[in-house]
C-alpha cells in the first residue's frame, strides 16, 4: 500500500511533524531507472538569447505569480503590485526574442514530439501565439529557399521538415473569465477565435494524440497539473513555477 500527497506547505513541514519522517522514498532517479518515467533535461535558453533581460524574480513575486490565475481581482492586484517586473516580462521585444528562439529550437526538434509553452498570463498566451505564428511562417519561407539550393538527399529531408511545419497546428488553451473580450481588446487582440476553437473542439484529446497535427499549445495555468501527454517532449517555461506546480 502506498500513500501519497502534494506537499503544499513547503515552508512549514507539517506532514513530517504530524506523522513522522518518510518510511521509504521512491524518487525520480529510481523511477527513471525502472522505466516508470522518462529522463528530464533542463536547458536555460534565456542565457542563449541575445539582449534578453529577465527581471529578478524574488520568492515574494514567485508566490504571487504562482497564484495569479485564481481570479481576476487577484491578477489585477498582482499586476499593480509588481507592475515593473510584469512590464519587463511581457515587453514586446522580449516576447519576440523568445518566440523567435522557440521557432528555431522546436523546429530543429521536429522529429521528437509535441510542445507546451507556458506563459505568464492569458493575454501573453495570445500575444506569444501571434509572435510564434509570425516567425513560424518566416521559417517556412526560409526553408523553401534552402530546399532550392540543397542537394537531392538534403532536399528530401528538408521537404519532410517543411511538410511537418506546414501541417503543424497551434492553439491557445486558457480558462474563460468575465469581460474577456474587452480585456483582450485593450491589447488589440481577438480572443473570440481562440475561444471558439476551445469550445468547439476537443483540444485535450487532439493534443494527446501523437498523430494529430495539433503539436503546440500555449497555456498559463490550464493543463499544467494532472494532464498526462505521452507524446509531449518539450515544455517551454516563461512563467516562474515551483514545487508541485512545476513537477506535476
Q: What feature does the model see in each segment?
A:
Residues 12-114, 128-134, 140-150:
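Interdomain helical connector at the RecA1-RecA2 junction of SF1/SF2 helicase-like NTPases
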Residues 12, 126-131, 228-231, 246-247:
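A short acidic (Asp/Glu
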Residues 6-10, 33, 46-50, 122-124, ...:
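Conserved nucleotide-binding/hydrolysis micro-motifs of P-loop NTPases
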Residues 215-219, 223-242, 246-247:
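A short beta-strand element within the Helicase C-terminal
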Residues 79-216:
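Conserved C-terminal RecA-like helicase domain
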Residues 1-12, 35, 117:
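Conserved helicase ATPase motor motifs in RecA-like P-loop NTPase domains
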Residues 23, 34-40, 112-113, 165-169, ...:
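Short glycine-/polar-rich loops that comprise or flank the Walker A/P-loop
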Amino acid at each position: 500500500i502506498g500513500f501519497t500527497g502534494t506537499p503544499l506547505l513547503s515552508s512549514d513541514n507539517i506532514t513530517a511533524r504530524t506523522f513522522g519522517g518518510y518510511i521509504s522514498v521512491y524518487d525520480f532517479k529510481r523511477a527513471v531507472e525502472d522505466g516508470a518515467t522518462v529522463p528530464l533535461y533542463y536547458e536555460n535558453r534565456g542565457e542563449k538569447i541575445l539582449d534578453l533581460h529577465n527581471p529578478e524574480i524574488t520568492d515574494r513575486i514567485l508566490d504571487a505569480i504562482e497564484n495569479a490565475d485564481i481570479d481576476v481581482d487577484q491578477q489585477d492586484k498582482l499586476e499593480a503590485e509588481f507592475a515593473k517586473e510584469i512590464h519587463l516580462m511581457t515587453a514586446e521585444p522580449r516576447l519576440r526574442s523568445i518566440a523567435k528562439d522557440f521557432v528555431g529550437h522546436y523546429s530543429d526538434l521536429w522529429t521528437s514530439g509535441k510542445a507546451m509553452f507556458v506563459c505568464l498570463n492569458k493575454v501573453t498566451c495570445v500575444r506569444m501565439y501571434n509572435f510564434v505564428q509570425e516567425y513560424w511562417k518566416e521559417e517556412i519561407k526560409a526553408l523553401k529557399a534552402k530546399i532550392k539550393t540543397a542537394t537531392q538527399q538534403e532536399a528530401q529531408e528538408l521537404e519532410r521538415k517543411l511538410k511537418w511545419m506546414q501541417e503543424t497546428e497551434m492553439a491557445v488553451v486558457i480558462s474563460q473569465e468575465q469581460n474577456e473580450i474587452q480585456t483582450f481588446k485593450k491589447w488589440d487582440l481577438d480572443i473570440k477565435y481562440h475561444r471558439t476553437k476551445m469550445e468547439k473542439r476537443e483540444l485535450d484529446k487532439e493534443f494527446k494524440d501523437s498523430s494529430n497535427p495539433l503539436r503546440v499549445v500555449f497555456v498559463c495555468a490550464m493543463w499544467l497539473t494532472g494532464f498526462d501527454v505521452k507524446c509531449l517532449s518539450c515544455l517551454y517555461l516563461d512563467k516562474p513555477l515551483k514545487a508541485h506546480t512545476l513537477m506535476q
